[in-house]
Structure formats: C-alpha cells, structure tokens
C-alpha cells in the first residue's frame, strides 16, 4: 500500500550556484511591487543572473568583517570543559568533538595541555596539533559588548587543559583559536 511504501520524493528545484540571499530578496521586492500578491499565486518562475565572482567577494568580505569585529570584542570562552577527556582513548575524544555541531570549515579541538606560549590539542578529525601563541593572543576576555579584559600574556590566561574550543584554518598559523560570532 502507499502508506507502507518508502518515501522517495525529493526536491528537484533549481539550486543556486552561490549564496545571494540579499539579491534574491531585492528581486522578490521588485517583483512584488510589479505583480502584488499575484507573484505568489500565479506560478511564476523567475531567473536572475549576477556576477558570481563579485558576489563571492562580497560574501567573503562580510564574513571576514564579522569575524574581525567579533574577535575585537573579546573571547567568550570555551564551548565546554571536559577534563575527563584528556586521558580518554582517541575514539572517545574524537567522538565527543564530532558531537559538537560544525561551523563552516572549522574544527572543534580538545586542549590536552598548555605551556607558556603553546597549547597542544586534539582535533575532531583525530589529528593532534599545536596552537601557537600567535593563534591565541587575540583572545582578551569578553565582558560585555562594550567591555573586554586586558590582552592575555600567556596561553593559560585563555585556555586550560580539557577546554573544548573551535579552531579555524588560517594563512599565518595552521589553526587559529576561534569562536562562532554572535552578531545581530
């Protein structure tokens, strides 16, 4: 019967080549001004073109601007601290890290140990890495949106063993301590 049959339906709609939500909204508003509510009721199909290189550049600039702004306003701390994971087997460490939702091409990392100018970490993909001071020194403590603490002078001012943090790929250092931006 139809009730027992597996659901095999899937969306066959057009998939955009690039994220362009603002352009799509601008087009929708223009069409609404022209067609009113008929826009939604008459089965219209609308295609528009943009220069994808410019849109990608705009998206990248906004993304980088948001990250820079968020970093300037301080580090809000680790996702959580799990001291029990430091000596746990590799598969348990990686599973705990993989259970945390991903953000873009970032990784979650478990801080295994902290030295004066470095932190040893396990990434969600199982690799071990060292976070150098240059990847951490930006992380002055966030107090509120208008106030943050002094710049840290050593890694222990920012991280402790057992911290679970996010790191993102960086040109200057392999991995940069990161946090998911909280902008409105």
Language-model segments: residues:
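N-terminal post-signal-peptidase region of extra-cytosolic proteins
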Residues: 93-100, 143-155
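Short, compositionally biased
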Residues: 175-184
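A short macromolecule-binding patch
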Residues: 126-145
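Active-site loop and adjoining helix of the penicillin-binding protein/serine DD-peptidase-beta-lactamase fold
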Residues: 42-50, 151-160, 184
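Flexible glycine-rich surface loops and low-complexity tracts that mediate binding to linear polymers
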Residues: 54, 109-114, 150-175
């Amino acid at each position: 019967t139809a009730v027992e049959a597996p659901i095999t339906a899937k969306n066959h709609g057009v998939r955009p080549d690039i994220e362009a939500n603002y352009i799509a909204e601008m087009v929708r508003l223009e069409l609404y001004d022209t067609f009113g509510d008929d826009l939604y009721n008459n089965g219209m199909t609308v295609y528009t073109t943009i220069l994808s290189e410019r849109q990608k550049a705009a998206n990248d600039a906004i993304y980088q601007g948001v990250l820079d702004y968020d970093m300037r306003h301080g580090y809000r701390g680790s996702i959580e601290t799990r001291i029990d994971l430091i000596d746990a087997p590799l598969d348990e460490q990686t599973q705990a890290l993989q259970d945390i939702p991903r953000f873009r091409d970032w990784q979650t990392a478990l801080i295994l140990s902290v030295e004066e100018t470095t932190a040893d970490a396990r990434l969600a993909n199982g690799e071990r890495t060292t976070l150098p001071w240059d990847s951490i020194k930006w992380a002055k403590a966030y107090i509120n949106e208008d106030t943050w603490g002094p710049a840290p002078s050593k890694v222990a001012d920012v991280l402790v063993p057992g911290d679970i943090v996010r790191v993102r790929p960086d040109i200057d250092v392999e991995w940069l301590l990161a946090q998911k931006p909280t902008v409105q």
